[in-house]
Structures are given as structure tokens and as C-alpha cells.
Amino acid sequence: MDKKFYITTLGCPKNIADSMSMHHSLLEEGFTLASLPEESDFHFINTCTFIQSATEETIQTILSAAQVKKQNHQKLVVVGCFAERYPDNIHSEIPEVDLFFGTGKYSQAGKILREKFPELSPSQLEFNDSLLERWKLSSKIENYSKPYAYVKVSDGCNRGCSFCIIPSFRGKFVESPLDDILRDTNRAIRAGAKEICLVSQDTVYYGRDSEILLDMVRKVAEIDSLEILRLLYLYPDKKTEKLIRLMGETSKIAPYLESPLQHVSSKILKVMNRTGESSYFKDLFSLAREVKPGLEIRTSFIIGYPGEEPEDVDQILRFIEDTRPEKVNLFSYSPQEGTKGAQLKQTVSEKEKSKRINLIRDSHLEILEEIHESRIGRTYDAIVDGIEDGQVVVRRFQDAPEMDEVVYVDDVSLIPGRIGKVRIDSFYEYDMNGTWV
């Protein structure tokens, strides 16, 4: 009997990479992918608990899935960060969950199911197709049909940012062996990916040594059939400078810098236990644009951290005005139990956090409108992601999948994965309309 699984993934691209690892493990054990959660025998929910809103979304998703389970006689499996952080709560408060496991067992998902449910004998699972053929078949369903894939280069983090709960359940930094990174990259490419996004909690920490990090990136970029290599989550430090210079030397690396600054006030950065200062960040962004023409920048800021005052917010506003990053993500600080930040006196009200976020967002939107205006009539290297509401979704190399702007075009003859050029014709607040040329 063919046993099917479905994976609901919450949170960031790192979770998507973990879901892909779980996906492959289940295929190896003979399971197949269902088109919808209600059609599955095993519904996996890969959870997120980075901030309070993510935790709330996770809980609501699990409860909704529990209702579906009652109607479809399926097993509900909760995995990842929430399961690692709150195992006792899941066990006592959500009895509908049949199985849960934490962040270190994604690649063992298939074997874990067999052990937990002995009735899943080999005779009940289909092994008629080769693993690669099953992967390609399942790639036609859900996330794996996309022309991009995420490959994790490490897990965990050693930075010790005072606002971050991740090390408490992801653990210390552990890098993936280079052979595993190359294997996962080649596997994704064989399944149809044209673009590989390297992800981790802290990509530039890889190898501890700059040359080891650069060598890893070079070797991935050297894979013949890889079209685009995108580097995500680059902590702003000296190793990132060297990585930026490599971007300028390597045509396959996308013209894109994602470096989450979290703040620019030296006072707040110190309380956050992060390094750097506004002038250094400006130099880093300038270097990136200098060595990689056409590069665009994505960064993020945490607003309302304990001790933040209006003048600290003004520093962010001035920084954005001076550096004009194309993509800015803003988080309202929420204290996480078990972090040093949660032990501090919470000095900024939720109302004030919202006010500050709106102020920064409005300021950046004015800049973004000017940036959009400058894009009109220009052509960009781009990749076709898929079709949405009858329009083809195209993404410039300057935009990361699932996070940044897209370009809508009317040419329905375009197929996912095609690479070419798109001309920008008009824009919305964030996304754009264009013509494939």
C-alpha cells in the first residue's frame, strides 16, 4: 500500500532546507508525496518559534491540522524548533499529535516513522521507482517544483546575540561537511533546480577560517549545471568582506547581499551582544556595490529592543537614507524566555514599537519608490519561478526566492526555470510588472 506524506513548512528558508532533507529521507524509505495535507497518511508540520508571532502561527497551524486529522484518519507529526523547545507542552496540551521530534533528526524522518509505527513493513511501501525518479515525480508537487533549492551549510550558532533563542534548541554551530553540501547541491540540481541558496544560522562562520569558507563557496559555484548561487544570512564582519570580494570575482554568485544588521546604534548593538557600528556597515554595503555592479541589498532591523530611544531610531533612519538598501525587513522585538534580552527591563511599549516600525517603513517606502522609478525601462537577468493567478512570476537575480520582489509578465509560454531577461514596465508598492525580452 502506498503511504503518503505532506510537509507544511513554517518560518525561514533554513526550515525549507530542513524540510527538503526530511522529504528526501521519506522518499528513501518508500513514502510518496501527497498533493494536499488531507490526502496524506502522515502530515508533518515543520515549526518555527523564532519570535512570538511565529510561535503563535505554529500553534494555530498545529490545531488546524489536528481538526483535519480527525476527518481523515491520518497521523500528525510535529517537528523542528517548536518541538525542540516545548516537548512537554505538546505532549500534555495537544494530544492529537502522534509524534514529535526536534531539530537534529530531519534526515532520519523515514526511519523514525518505521520505528514508531511498526505496521509500516517494507511490503506496505512502494519501491518500484528509483530514488531519483521518485524525487523528480514528487518535485512536481508543492515547493519542490520550484527552480530553486536551499542547501544548509551548517546548523546552530555561536554568536550569542542576547535577543535570540535559536542556540538554546539548535545548539552550537556545527558545519556540514563539504561533501554533504556538494551532494545536496547536485541532488537538487538533478531534480530540476537552477538556483541554489546556501543557508544557515550564520553562513560566514563556516570553517572558522576565511579560506575554508571561500573554498566551500568556490567549489559549489564550480558545479557545471548550476546557474545561480545565492548566499544568505551573512553576519556583517571581516569574513563577509572577503566573501563579498569573491562575489565580484564569481559570475554565478547572484548580485545580492543579505546581511541582517539588526540595529546600527552602537549602544543597542552592545546590549544585543553584536559587533559592528554604523560606519562599518556603510563601508560594507559600499564595498558590495563596488565589486558587484547591479547588486542589491537586503537587511533587517529589530525595533523596540530594551533601552532603545528615539535617537537610536533616528540613527536607523539616517542609515537607510544614506545607504538606500533596496530591501528592509523590520521586526518588533518580542522577549523570548531563556534569553538575556528577556531579563532586561522592557522599556518600549508595543504601541511605541509599532509607531517606530511604521516611521521606518514609510521612510524606506519613499526610497523604494525612487528605486522603482529608476528601474523602469531597464532589463535584468531573471529566472521564471512559476505561474500565479494566470500571470507568469519572474524573479530578477537581485531578488531572493520567497522573500523579495517579483516581476509579473503576461507571456504564458514561459516555463519555470527558464533564464533570460525581463524589462521593468511598472511597479506596485513592492512587486513589478514587466516584459520578457
Swiss-Prot record:
The reaction(s) annotated as catalysed by this protein in its Swiss-Prot or TrEMBL entry are: L-aspartate(89)-[ribosomal protein uS12]-hydrogen + (sulfur carrier)-SH + AH2 + 2 S-adenosyl-L-methionine = 3-methylsulfanyl-L-aspartate(89)-[ribosomal protein uS12]-hydrogen + (sulfur carrier)-H + 5'-deoxyadenosine + L-methionine + A + S-adenosyl-L-homocysteine + 2 H(+)
Record key words, sorted: 4Fe-4S, Cytoplasm, Iron, Iron-sulfur, Metal-binding, S-adenosyl-L-methionine, Transferase
This protein's major location comes to cytoplasm
- All copies of the Radical SAM core domain together span 143-370
Domain TRAM spans what residues? Answer: 373-437
Q: Which SMART domains does the record cross-reference, listed alphabetically?
A: Elp3
Q: Which residues bind [4Fe-4S] cluster 2?
A: 157, 161, 164
Q: Which residues form the signal peptide?
A: none
Compartments (UniProt record):
Cytoplasm
Sorted alphabetically, the Gene Ontology BP terms of this entry are: tRNA modification
So which cofactors does this thing need?
Answer: [4Fe-4S] cluster
State how the cofactor is bound: Binds 2 [4Fe-4S] clusters. One cluster is coordinated with 3 cysteines and an exchangeable S-adenosyl-L-methionine.
Classification via Gene3D superfamilies: Methylthiotransferase, N-terminal domain, Nucleic acid-binding proteins, tm_1862 like domain
Q: What are the binding positions for [4Fe-4S] cluster 1 in this chain? A: 12, 48, 81
The UniProt GO MF terms for this protein read: 4 iron, 4 sulfur cluster binding; aspartic acid methylthiotransferase activity; metal ion binding; protein methylthiotransferase activity
The residues covered by the MTTase N-terminal domain are 3-118
Q: Which GO terms describe its cellular component?
A: cytosol
Entry superkingdom? Bacteria
Class of this enzyme: transferase
What does the record give as EC number? 2.8.4.4
Main role?
A: Catalyzes the methylthiolation of an aspartic acid residue of ribosomal protein uS12.
The family annotation for this protein states:
Belongs to the methylthiotransferase family. RimO subfamily.
Protein name, per record: Ribosomal protein uS12 methylthiotransferase RimO
> What is the species of this protein?
Leptospira interrogans serogroup Icterohaemorrhagiae serovar Lai (strain 56601)
- Its gene is rimO
